C-alpha cells in the first residue's frame, strides 16, 4: 500500500519579476518536513510550479498524495490545460508557446509515479499550512541563493 502524504506548497516573488522563493510542508502520519529555497530572478507563477516540483522530487517512492496549493494557475494547468498543450506541441490556444514550458514538463514528469488529489485553498485565509508555506516562500525570496534556470525575461 503506497504511503498517504499531504503536501502544501506556495510560491512567492518580490517584484514579479524579481527574487522569488518556494515553501512546502510535507506530512506523513505525524512527521512533517519543510522546504524553503530562494531564487535570484523569477516570477510568482514559476515559484508556484517549482514549489510543487521540489516537494514531489523529495519523495523516494510512489505515493498517494493530497496536494494543497493556493495557485489556480498551477492547479488548472496540471489538471486541465496541460493535455492540450502536449497535444499541440506545447503551444497555447493562442498558438504561442506555453509560458514556463520547462517547469510544466518537469511537473508532468514528477507526477507520473504518484496518484495525486489536487486541492485549491484560498491564500491568506488563515489556512495554517498555507500560511507556513507562505512564510517559507517569503524567507526564500528574501535570501536567494539559486538561479532559476529557464526563467526568460519578457
Curated annotation (Swiss-Prot):
Top-level taxon: Bacteria
UniProt catalytic activity: Endonucleolytic cleavage to 5'-phosphomonoester
Record's cofactor remark: Binds 1 Mg(2+) ion per subunit. May bind a second metal ion at a regulatory site, or after substrate binding.
Cysteines paired by S-S bonds: none
Keyword annotations from UniProtKB, A to Z: Cytoplasm, Endonuclease, Hydrolase, Magnesium, Metal-binding, Nuclease
Gene Ontology terms: biological process: DNA replication, removal of RNA primer
UniProt-recorded Gene Ontology molecular function terms: magnesium ion binding; nucleic acid binding; RNA-DNA hybrid ribonuclease activity
HAMAP family: RNase_H
Protein name: Ribonuclease HI
Gene source species: Haemophilus influenzae (strain ATCC 51907 / DSM 11121 / KW20 / Rd)
Gene: rnhA
Amino acid at each position: 500500500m503506497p504511503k498517504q502524504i499531504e503536501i502544501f506548497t506556495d510560491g512567492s516573488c518580490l517584484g514579479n519579476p524579481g527574487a522569488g522563493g518556494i515553501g512546502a510542508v510535507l506530512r506523513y502520519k505525524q512527521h512533517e518536513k519543510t522546504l524553503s529555497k530562494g531564487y535570484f530572478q523569477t516570477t510568482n507563477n514559476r515559484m508556484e510550479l517549482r514549489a510543487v516540483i521540489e516537494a514531489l522530487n523529495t519523495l523516494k517512492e510512489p505515493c498517494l498524495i493530497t496536494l494543497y496549493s493556493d495557485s489556480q494557475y498551477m492547479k488548472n494547468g496540471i489538471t486541465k490545460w496541460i493535455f492540450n498543450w502536449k497535444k499541440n506541441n506545447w503551444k497555447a490556444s493562442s498558438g504561442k508557446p506555453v509560458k514556463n514550458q520547462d517547469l510544466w514538463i518537469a511537473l508532468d514528469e514528477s507526477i507520473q509515479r504518484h496518484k495525486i488529489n489536487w486541492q485549491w485553498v484560498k491564500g491568506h485565509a488563515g489556512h495554517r499550512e498555507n500560511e507556513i508555506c507562505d512564510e517559507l516562500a517569503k524567507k526564500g525570496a528574501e535570501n536567494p541563493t539559486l538561479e532559476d534556470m529557464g526563467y526568460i525575461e519578457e
